[in-house]
Amino acid sequence: ISHVSDSTFYDVLKISKAPVIASHSSCRFFTPGFQRNMSDDMIRELGKNGGVIQINFGASFLDSLARVNSKVLDSLEKLLISKGLTSRDSAAQPIIDQFAMNHAELYSDVDRVADHIDHVVRLIGIDHVGIGSDFDGVGDSLPLGLKDVSDYPNLIFVLLKRGYTPEDIE
């Protein structure tokens, strides 16, 4: 239900006989007005349903500042296109890395992902939050220190530091 409107979300919960999954959404609490994320009320209702919200790692899903600065990210995409590349091309990686160094303020970080996890845990408990990443859908807007699955140890470290147990994380 990660791509549905708020009203459709509530309609789904009314008719669903099974727990519902938001496979790649985050908390609107941190991104007021960003409709793709879930409000606290939606998250609470999802918990009552037995469902799970899996946190999206895209910058615009994690932080309002990243959404404001998306025009700068658009300039990176235009640069890559001008060179006949996409963000998934290995030849683009040095360009992306340099861009990230020059514009670090545009990217969120692992701590912000953990903030979203913390928020869901406070609202509905650890059993209702997961990792949705959206690695294949958010382009080069992934958090610093969490650019691909090989960076998961960075997130695990932050969660352990915040008091989560290995069992919580599993």
Regions found by a protein language model. Give the residues of each.
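Histidine/acidic residue-rich metal-binding segments in metalloenzymes
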Residues: 1-21, 35-51, 112-127
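Active-site environment of divalent metal-dependent phosphoester hydrolases
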Residues: 4-11, 27-30, 59-63, 137-139
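Conserved, mostly hydrophobic/aromatic
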Residues: 24, 53, 134, 169
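Aromatic-lined glycan-binding groove of carbohydrate-active enzymes
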Residues: 39-95
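Extended C-terminal subregions enriched in glycine
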Residues: 52, 58, 101-110, 120-123
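Short acidic/histidine-rich active-site segments
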Residues: 55-57, 124-146
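Intrinsically disordered, low-complexity acidic Ser/Thr-rich regulatory segments
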Residues: 90-115
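Mid-to-C-terminal alpha-helical segments outside catalytic/metal-binding sites
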Residues: 147-170
